[in-house]
Amino acid sequence: MSEASRLCSGYYSLNQSFVEPFQCPRRGEGAALQYCCGFADLKYCCSEPGSYFPYKHSYMWSLSIGALIGLGIAALVLLAFVISVCVLCYLFLYTKPQRLDTGLKLQHLEASSTQEGKSNGKTKALNSNAASNATNETYYEADDIIQEKTMDATQIHIAY
């Protein structure tokens, strides 16, 4: 073991008083404390080279209660944020409005007129009678009748 690791050089402590250089182990200390350890403002003899804390590590928990409380609050806020984001994503993805039935089915007039023509002979009679009058009036009357019958059929389907 080198003599340099046993010699602690002089230093200024926190209260700006000068501490004289000393040799490890000091008088009254155990023989195992052979190394000079510590910082520039606090030096002491220790059993392992490179040790920087003269106290047990548990002192750090008692000194940082405020930091632990702050970290705990920050963790709770982060947890609340993550839960809120998850709930909002669930609501957005799984509670989309369902397709509402307006009660009206959209159909092409040609398709509905052929279906009505097959099922109802009165429409054909109306079309042939109206053709003798005026061509424009025939189309308007036939379209009105077809639309009324389509709406009636749709309302019957909705009622069931």
UniProtKB/Swiss-Prot annotation:
Intracellular or extracellular location(s): Membrane
UniProt cross-references to InterPro entries, sorted A to Z: Shisa (IPR026910), Shisa_N (IPR053891)
Coiled-coil boundaries: none
A family per Pfam: Shisa_N
UniProt main location, coarse: membrane
Entry's transmembrane regions: 65-85
Keywords from the UniProt entry: Membrane, Transmembrane, Transmembrane helix
GO CC, alphabetical: membrane
Membrane topology qualifier: Single-pass membrane protein
Span of the signal peptide: none
Annotated family: Belongs to the shisa family.
The name this protein goes by in its record: Protein shisa-like-2B
